[in-house]
Amino acid sequence: IEMAAAVGAPASEVPQNMYPISIPYVSGSPEFAQAPDTTTVNGDEVEITTAKGNSKTVQVVVPAYFRDYQSLAWNVASFDKSFNPAATGAILLKEVMWSQDFLGGMHVTETDEEVEADSAKMDQDGKHSLGVSAADGFNGMMLTEMSIDKLQIMQEQLGFNGKELGVKFGPDYNPANGAIWFAHKVAVEEGSESGVKSIKGLKVTDATSSLRDTWQMLWPVGEFFAFTDQRTANSAQNPAFSAVFDGAPFAAAPNANTDSVDSNDVVATDAFSLANNISNLLFQNMAALHYNQKQGTFVTEYQQGTQGNRVDVYDASYSMAALSIYQRAKDALPVGYASAESSDVNLKSESGKKALSMIKGQADFILTNLIGKNGLVFDGMTIDKSMTRDASQSVDAQFAAIRGLVAAFLATDDVKYKQAARSIYLAVEKNMFDKNINTWSAKPGQATIHTPYTSAAISAGLREAMLHLKNEEGENEPALELTALTDRYVSWFRGVINGGMQLSEWMGDSGENQIKGSSSTDTDEDGVHQVIAAGGKFGTAMTMANKVSVK
């Protein structure tokens, strides 16, 4: 109710029986445990345009489950009741990206009209409320609260030193004085408090510090750092963000954490202090536990006090992307979808300089050691006397490398990384495009397994290509024309995502509707069915498949 009031949203419009997830389990089946309540509770007349270009005015009905989530619970028997940092980081990134979008402006409370925030106190004038609209503002509030919950649990309960769980750490953390990390897998014993599930007990089942876990947490925590940044030196902070964290509705950071001195930072539980503390631990561990200083590359594991010798191109590439966000956040540069933009403020922090050095080292290592004669990158290598490279060259690795090298180019302004990314994309087009499925395959003519990590890399790699690798004046590669890149994105999305990766579709903003008098469960004609008709005994939630075969 307090959050609804802060954004000018009627409390009566908040969906009933919400169960916000403080921190996710590592896996589970998204099939519903019972039939969703499809009782009609409302209706409206709307104009729709389908994916096939058909436009019409229809009468839509609103089922009960759209406003009351009680019947949408998943089958808990399918859950792996364990915590994993990469899983937590993945959902945290989604939360913070949307939070910044929803809370990046304010709105006139009476009319719901979006306006730019001209001060951090604008929401206190009796005319304006937080959020770009009442509905979006409420969503941003909920997501921010869920993000804070995750970080509090990680700070207070999940620090691990190889022997003990729940080890405390502070902003002065230095691995040289004893490494503390987030273990790869922690089993959860459930309890119950105030009618909801709680953490009764925790037990480490895989003590490894994983590079994937580390970068996949560093990226969103870096974003959250920038979103919640209250440092006095950051004069470029969005006033709309500052208003969210000024004590109402969310706590402000203590002065020790917002002044220009890092050495006096303290542990606290407000949003910015959590991000400040946890991002430092993750960054220090990237540098000390996972970065091979001699070779200039990240390795996948740290176990029993020893750094591993396995280099994985996917994780090394995304480590560059994560580090670039962290560097920009520390230096008060724009992040999120503005992470390629400049700013009048650049704090040029020591941490930022160190991050840039590792980004450059990793990018150079890939260019020197991991590109084959066919122009494609190898999936990885083992650091040994012979520096043994993998034989495989997956779709995942190619697009991850493109994503990472573009991040390196934007961070360092070294054009050789941009040219390398362009060359890899052209090699992908030459060696991997399968005309029969109108998208890429590891071996054209054969089935390729796609996971959400595959989809993430392809989507991100193509986005970077469209923004930063497309032909400019004097360049004429047909495959790198913007129209060609756009066509590739659309054909991939329709064939792989709509073709099977996306399991179901929610109604409303997605374009999907329940139409009065119609039995169709794909009314927007994009090939993805509504949650009530997407497989399983009672239907399936709108998630991505864990694995699909594309052929």
How would you name each of these model-derived features?
Residues 1-551:
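Glycan-recognition and catalytic cores of secretory/periplasmic carbohydrate-active enzymes
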